[in-house]
Amino acid sequence: MIKSFRHKGLERFFRKNDSRGIQVQHASRVGRILSLLDEASSPEQLNIPGLFLHPLKGERKGEWAMTVSGNWRVTFCFDGEDVIAVNLEDYH
């Protein structure tokens, strides 16, 4: 279950289905990713073809990312079975 967000527009999209805080062309894929994150209790449950789940490295060790489009990723962490610190970013 998603417990916290870093990106206010992403949180608004998740809670109110208001896409003003994200790019319109990303809405469908981001919506799918958020639904999966809300149902997941471990990274293994998110290893879905086409979403390219991968752990981050270096200073971001412990964080995970899923591909939205181009360089855009939804990043997040697990805290036990909960998903926290959900963000939408271009970290490349």
Language-model regions, residue ranges each:
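Glycine-rich, flexible loop/turn motifs
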Residues: 1, 18, 42, 49-52, ...
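Arg/Lys-rich, positively charged N-terminal/basic patches that mediate binding to nucleic acids
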Residues: 1-33
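Conserved phosphate-interacting/catalytic interface
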Residues: 37
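A short, surface-exposed loop/turn module that caps and links secondary-structure elements
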Residues: 41-64
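Enriched for short, Lys/Arg-rich terminal
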Residues: 57, 65-92
